[in-house]
């Protein structure tokens, strides 16, 4: 489904750019000349697309999951079916879900985003519900005793106490989405999956492109993981020991 | 549109039953081989580190790193190094499965109540006995939870191998042109079924294990 991009120099043979380097001719693991030449037209745009795919999916997923969690906490009987529903979404293999959505929304970024959002729901919904539910009843009792309104209790007591669970959910969701978004290139040329699929689809497998794009995907995930780990520490100073 | 795909999928299942069975067996073989190898590597390491209360950083970074490695990249690297086939896919899945098993095993053993461990030590149990008779039984639920996460994850990820000629149910999913959207959906349902069955089997094992250790605890 992902065509080979010969015209814009996606493969190891680059007829219009003069002699390929010795590294490229031998399909080396890390030909810096190719990376220099195609950073601007291949790698950087793919990286930016990938970040966009991830942020949009996790952003929308978070809003939906938060809403669902609030509904589940208010109406407890809805929690089991919502949990099963998000579990079920998570169990559909990404390769199939991307294709199943095509009749609904076509070969578009929207299709990819719907699939990615549905995967984030499982992680985010569970963590938000667990976090909000873990607030001890006597803490809520004393908040009420101090005269806080329901809204104040939620914003100043429940939400901060649920923060560790919510943040760890966000962290897992973002990293997982970065990983799953690479599969999206099976459908459309978008994100870091596109150069990865191109590289694997090239006869002989174009190693430099695979390693460069794959390495960027791994680096992006690791960076996000690290940043969110710091955010977790910064936002929950009372929780430093764990 | 959705309803007709659903109907197609349920027509596909009886008409292609032997194909689905064959592909499911391939997926199961690949996933279970990868899980077994990952267990052999991660279980002893996690038990030992957890027992010694060392290597927190290793356990945490293993889980971060494991989550951060996209399966497509790993399988691509596997193909680049080992060529298309069973072992490159198995290798990628082993790497992915090690992380949750190692992290959960570590925290399962490390998190056992230190009073219980001290009491066992005071009763004269050797370190090996403490590990096998106190820490392992008490940590077993968390350990098996890690195994369950790894199993479901590996089975779902094994389908990605189908894109690159790895066989299994992913093979059907990657060839919509041949099998139609109904076939893709049918294969997806079978993958979910396989994951559910494995998770259920591990849940049963967990219950059996905790029943066996209960009188001793």
Name every feature range the model reports, one short phrase each.
Chain A
Residues 127-166, 196:
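Short cytoplasmic-facing helical segments at TM-TM junctions of multi-pass membrane proteins
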Residues 55, 118, 150-184, 212, ...:
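Transmembrane alpha-helices
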Residues 232-242:
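Short cytosolic juxtamembrane segments of multi-pass membrane proteins
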Residues 68-101, 126-130:
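Cytoplasmic-entry segments and transmembrane alpha-helices of multi-pass inner-membrane transporters
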Residues 42-53, 102-123, 209-214:
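Loop-to-helix entry region at the N-terminal start of transmembrane alpha-helices
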Residues 192-232:
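Hydrophobic alpha-helical transmembrane segments of polytopic membrane proteins
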Residues 3-57, 202-203:
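Periplasmic/extracellular loop-to-transmembrane helix junction in inner-membrane transport proteins
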Residues 63-68, 111-140, 163, 170-178, ...:
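Membrane-embedded alpha-helices of multi-pass transport/permease systems
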């Amino acid at each position: 489904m992902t065509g080979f991009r010969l015209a814009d120099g996606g493969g190891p043979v680059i007829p219009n750019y003069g002699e390929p380097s010795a590294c490229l001719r031998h399909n080396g693991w890390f030909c810096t000349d190719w990376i220099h030449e195609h950073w601007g037209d291949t790698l950087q745009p793919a990286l930016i697309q990938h970040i966009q795919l991830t942020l949009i999916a996790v952003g929308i997923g978070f809003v939906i999951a938060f809403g669902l969690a609030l509904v589940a906490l208010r109406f407890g009987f809805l929690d089991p079916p919502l949990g099963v529903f998000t579990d079920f979404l998570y169990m559909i293999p990404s390769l199939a879900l991307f294709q199943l959505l095509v009749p609904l929304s076509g070969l578009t970024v929207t299709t990819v985003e719907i699939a990615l959002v549905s995967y984030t729901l499982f992680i985010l919904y569970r963590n938000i519900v667990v976090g909000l539910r873990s607030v001890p009843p006597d803490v809520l009792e004393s908040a009420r005793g101090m005269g806080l309104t329901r809204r104040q209790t939620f914003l100043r007591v429940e939400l901060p106490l649920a923060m560790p669970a919510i943040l760890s959910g966000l962290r897992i969701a973002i990293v997982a989405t970065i990983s799953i978004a690479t599969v999206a290139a099976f459908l459309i040329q978008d994100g870091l999956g596109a150069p990865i699929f191109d590289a694997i689809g090239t006869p002989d497998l174009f190693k430099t492109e695979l390693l460069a794009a794959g390495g960027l995907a791994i680096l992006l995930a690791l960076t996000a993981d690290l940043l969110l780990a710091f955010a977790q520490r910064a936002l929950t100073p009372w929780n430093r020991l764990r | 549109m959705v309803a007709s795909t659903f109907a197609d999928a349920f027509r596909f299942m009886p008409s292609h039953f032997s194909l689905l069975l064959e592909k499911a067996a391939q997926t199961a073989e690949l996933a279970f081989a990868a899980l077994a190898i990952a267990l052999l590597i991660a279980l002893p390491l996690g038990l030992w580190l957890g027992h010694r209360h060392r290597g927190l950083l290793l356990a945490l970074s293993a889980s971060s790193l494991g989550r951060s490695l996209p399966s497509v990249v790993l399988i691509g690297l596997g193909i680049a190094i080992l060529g298309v086939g069973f072992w490159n896919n198995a290798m990628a899945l082993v790497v992915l499965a090690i992380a949750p098993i190692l992290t959960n095993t570590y925290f399962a053993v490390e998190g056992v109540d230190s009073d219980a461990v001290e009491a066992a030590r005071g009763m004269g149990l050797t370190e090996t006995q403490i590990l096998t008779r106190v820490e392992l039984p008490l940590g077993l639920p968390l350990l098996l939870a890690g195994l369950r996460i790894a199993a479901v994850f590996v089975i779902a990820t094994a389908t990605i191998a189908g894109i690159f000629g790895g066989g299994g149910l992913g093979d059907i999913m990657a060839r919509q042109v041949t099998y139609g959207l109904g076939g893709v959906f049918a294969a997806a349902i079978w993958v979910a079924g396989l994951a559910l069955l494995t998770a259920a089997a591990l849940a049963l094992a967990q219950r059996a294990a905790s029943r066996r250790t209960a009188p001793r605890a």
